Regions:
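Conserved Nudix-box catalytic region and its N-terminal flanking loop in Nudix hydrolases
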Residues: 20-60
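Active-site-adjacent beta-strand/loop module that shapes the phosphate/pyrophosphate-binding cleft
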Residues: 19, 75-98, 109
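Short secondary-structure boundary/capping segments
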Residues: 5, 13-14, 29, 80, ...
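Conserved N-terminal beta-strand and adjoining loop/helix that marks the start
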Residues: 1-22, 43, 74-75, 93
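A generic structural micro-feature
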Residues: 3-7, 33-36, 80-86, 102-105
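A short coil-to-beta-strand element that immediately follows conserved catalytic motifs
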Residues: 65-74
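NUDIX/MutT-family hydrolases
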Residues: 91, 100-133
Length: 136
């Protein structure tokens, strides 16, 4: 019997507070992308709903309470460490709390759209943020 290739599902959460989006810098001591500025992200656990995963990841990585929009901003195929995955990008609105970083990140910023590219946030994420940015 052959072994099936695993297809992971991950979520990325664009957390907004008014007209700014949360961006976090990966820990310099971490194995995965040290120094990379990104949004909240993580794998969906087996049997877990992607929206529940999005809420869980935000709480684990930031300590914030958010409301996650049910309709994803986008989804795309990616790979990490050679493993294929589907990434579902959600938009969330900050409800309460102050950011308390987990060991995964060294710093955070509430950014305006132009700052994302300046920080070196991956272009695919900048495009998703542009689509999700609050109007007005």
């Amino acid at each position: 019997m052959g072994e099936e290739a695993r297809q992971w599902v991950a979520v990325t959460v664009l957390v907004f507070r008014r007209d700014r989006m949360l961006s976090m810098c990966r820990a310099a001591s971490g194995a995965a992308g040290p120094g990379l500025w990104e949004a909240v992200s993580g794998r969906v656990q087996s049997g877990e709903d992607p929206i529940a995963a999005a809420r869980r990841e935000v709480t684990e990585e930031t300590g914030l309470t958010v409301s996650v929009q049910a309709r994803p901003v986008t989804a795309y195929a990616a790979s990490r460490r050679g493993e294929p995955m589907t990434v579902i990008v959600f938009r969330a609105e900050h409800e309460e709390g102050e950011v308390v970083l987990s060991e995964e990140h060294d710093a955070y910023r509430w950014c305006v759209l132009a700052e994302l590219s300046e920080l070196g946030v991956p272009e695919q994420l900048v495009e998703a943020a542009r689509d999700a940015w609050p109007s007005g």
